[in-house]
Amino acid sequence: MFNFAVSRESLLSGFQWFFFIFCNTVVVPPTLLSAFQLPQSSLLTLTQYAFLATALACFAQAFCGHRRAIMEGPGGLWWGTILTITLGEASRGTPINDIATSLAVGIALSGVLTMLIGFSGLGHRLARLFTPSVMVLFMLMLGAQLTTIFFKGMLGLPFGIADPNFKIQLPPFALSVAVMCLVLAMIIFLPQRFARYGLLVGTITGWLLWYFCFPSSHSLSGELHWQWFPLGSGGALSPGIILTAVITGLVNISNTYGAIRGTDVFYPQQGAGNTRYRRSFVATGFMTLITVPLAVIPFSPFVSSIGLLTQTGDYTRRSFIYGSVICLLVALVPALTRLFCSIPLPVSSAVMLVSYLPLLFSALVFSQQITFTARNIYRLALPLFVGIFLMALPPVYLQDLPLTLRPLLSNGLLVGILLAVLMDNLIPWERIE
């Protein structure tokens, strides 16, 4: 039975949860706006869709899924993959409507597949493929891809096709770097009781400083126009994009295991049964499926929630649900959406960059479960460097590849993970000294 008793501490923790959910969500719509070449007036609709879907997904997990204080939001793997596919295919002349339609079909299929994994209990077997070595690579490459996105946001770089006339504005970038340093300083140097509010303080301070330094900056414009498939629809289907989306959905299950396993220490009385994973998969798949018409980034439990739980020391669902309720209110009231979305992208990107730097620590924790030698290091080195190479490869050089393979091979993160899964599970590394 859920306890709805309200206290000052739970409300404060709930507000902290809201800003955590908010900052992880608000950075996404502007990148989609840029990547899919939409007018600025569409940003309010995309942002409200994102807040609404994220709040409902958090409720679904809190009451019907894993039932823990773990944020369910736009998955970083999905986000990076969608931006990579869109940029790569658009640069080759593929119509935006074709990209959006194919992604919608692939995301819907992955949602159904995730639900089937939950209903059937196959997730436990698939989890065995994600060995510690694979998770080291996953954390390193996901961190590299996401921090690239956040640095782009800090610099104000476009997320779509490169604009030759674009120039970096140094004063806004300098302010975003100052916000990043403020959050880092709070986390590193202040006592734990103050450091846990670094994200909150950094966001509000950066917000105020931005409008003090750049008072002419425009606010969120446009009216709310509810519509299905705002990124585009009715285009031709691309088997390669659909296949890449389905594979992304399969790889995305690693986030569920990482988040639930990582929070076991906070909920020792709940045990480690398979039922919790099955419910979480069903909730993730269901929310991914029903929100396809809203064109939001598909969901996954956030492993970074572990850091927030550690910082605040509050593991209760109550505070998490309070934060989700505030997020829902922001989604339903356009005036609140406009207010909170006036937080500039460089500021929110700087705060989120700091929150994702600990992915390196997660990678190092997984690496401690492996004994690397001069002979078995190739299980990590080859997938890692192949993935990094493909991440840096300009999309134009893949122009002549078959349409079925092109979206997958242009995604260094996915290729690196798949190569690591194959090498780690097909080669008997335990026999190699």
From Swiss-Prot:
Cytoplasmic side: 39-42, 90-102, 152-169, 218-230, 310-319, 367-379, 429-433
Induction comment from the UniProt entry of this chain: By glyoxylate.
A cellular component term, taken from the record's GO annotations: plasma membrane
Family according to the record: Belongs to the nucleobase:cation symporter-2 (NCS2) (TC 2.A.40) family.
Membrane topology: Multi-pass membrane protein
Gene: ybbY
Main location (coarse class): membrane
Coiled-coil segments: none
Pfam families registered for this protein in UniProt: Xan_ur_permease
GO biological process, one term: xanthine transport
InterPro entries assigned to the protein according to its UniProt record, in alphabetical order: NCS2 (IPR006043)
Locations listed in the record: Cell inner membrane
The keyword Ribonucleoprotein appears for this protein: no
Name of the featured protein: Putative purine permease YbbY
